[in-house]
Amino acid sequence: GRGDWIEALGMDVPETYDELHELLMAMKNQYGCTTAIYLDSAAVGNDNFLAAGYGAPCMLATNAKESYWMVQDGTVMDGITNEGYKEYLTMLHQWYEDGLISRDFANAPGAMDPSGMSEITSGNCGVFFNGAPMMSMYSAMSDDPNLRLIGLPDPVKTKGEKTHVDTTEYDFGVERMSISTKCSDPELAIQYCDFWFTDQGIQLANYGVEGLSCEVVDGKSQFTD
């Protein structure tokens, strides 16, 4: 989220849904952002950060199903049919009525899409959902020198509550690499895998080759096209 806005508003980092709602309203009123919280169609799926505080399904998987089975109080049930998910949707409806969510959220591109990125970097969005490593890329793409993004905790109904996020479906995560026993040079293969976690590898993966697909201006990477 926009840490610089939170500081300028004199507000604390939100921990509960009520605190987050109060912050979003303040961002909308103070900065005129039409998308105080950026949500796409995944907002009503189960791979988002908002649902978990209601005990509703939250599964960190890019190819998660629209619903999945869960066990609640010893009863097997479809995750999106529990009472918590209904509360979650009721809250989203209220936020939609308050003008905090884009009127066209069902057709909104993801936060990794160029259009979604522009919502975040242009000052039209206060809170969004994406991986922490993406914050540096959003900052580099923004023309706002004051933009400062910070991580926010998953909101809960009451302070002190814990959220439960399912990551057990995939033993090695959604994206993984493995080295076959047939590999002729496993040490070189490991070096290749490690490369993508270096500064040079991250730069190459996100912007491509400097001088070809991007240029570095004042310490910030910019696409040439």
Which residues fall in each region the model found?
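Extracytoplasmic/secretory soluble proteins
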Residues: 1-225
